[in-house]
Structures are given as C-alpha cells and as structure tokens.
Amino acid sequence: QNYVVVPVSADRGLCGGFNSSINKETFRLVKSLEDDGKNVQLMPVGKKSRDFFNRVMKDKILDSFADLNVSVNGYDAALQVSNKLQELYFDGKFDKCIIVFNKFKSAISQEVTQQQLIPLDVSDSSKEENVDDSAVKAIYDYEPDEETILKDLLPKNVSIQIFKVLLESDAGEHGARMAAMDNATRNAGEMIDSLTLKYNRTRQAFITKELIEIISGA
C-alpha cells in the first residue's frame, strides 16, 4: 500500500515543542509504516515541517505547503491542501492519507494526533448499539441517489476535515507561543535578579577591598 503522511506544523518558531513534537511523531510514523512494508511519501504543511523533512527525508516529499495563513485565508487555505490530495488520490498516487497535527486542548495544552483522512474512516463506535440499521435507513429517501450524493459530499468532507485541522493547529500554535514567551519572560526576570544580586555582591566586595587598602595604608 502507498501512504501519504501530512504533518501540519507552524510557519514560525518560538512556540516551545509545538513543531518538534509534530516532526518527531511523523518521523516515527513513517519508520513504523516502512517497517510494515508500506511505501510512504510526505506532504508537509507549514515551513517548520517542510524544512525539517527537506533535511532528513527529502526524497519522500511529494509536495509541500507554507504560508497558508488559515486565520486570514480561512477555508481557501484548506482547499489548497484538499484539492492537491484529492488530485493525487484519484491519479492513484496513494491509497491512504494520514494527517498528523496538534489537537487543541486548551491555551496551554496541545495533543499530537494522527487522523486517517483518506479514505474516510467510519468508526462503528459512533453507532448506538441498540439502533436497528434497517429502521434508520427506511426513514431517509435519497435524491438523486446515495452514490451521487456521496461523490459530492466526500470531497467536501475531506476539505472540511483539513480546515478543522488547520484551525486547531493555528489555535494550538498561538497557545504554545504564548506559553513559551511567558516562560521566557519569567526566566529572563529570574536571570536579571540573579545577575543583579551577583553584581551587587561583586561591587560590595570591591568597595570593601578598597576600604581595607585605605585603612591599611593609613
């Protein structure tokens, strides 16, 4: 099977381990898939992942995206990635696509997450155990037909899933950067206090030494 892995990172740094965690998880996933005999290619989203994998796995990069700026460009940013993925999929370039991103948990917490994007992963866990499928299907009437509707909806679903991922990653990036800058400011404050104390002690010792020399000379 041919896989495409899409790591989603930020375009900028100064956000703690936000980018490195994505790159490490993607690297681990690629090696794991290759150990299982899979053929793996990459399509990094974000400069930090693109630059990292250009150094360590350049031969595996199928395409890449940077400066999507989802907070400004919105859904159009997701469409750029989605359209390229679907084009490659329908051309038979890959069988499965997995996206790796930082899932937003809170302003100070993000969780590295893997999600199968293509083909659509329909989990049975979302179904009610006591629901009769035949009874549910009997309620709905499809026009024109289920297959035609799915052909239209599935590409849109991929685009929406990517849009969701980009938004979560963007929110997580801002949270991670805020936390990183807060820690840096706190550490800088502690360093200033430490250096100020060291300076005052050195100055005091120097003055004491001069006084002793003056007294000794007198």
Where are these regions (language model features)?
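C-terminal beta-strand-loop-alpha-helix "lid" module of Rossmann-like NAD(P)-dependent dehydrogenases
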Residues: 1-218
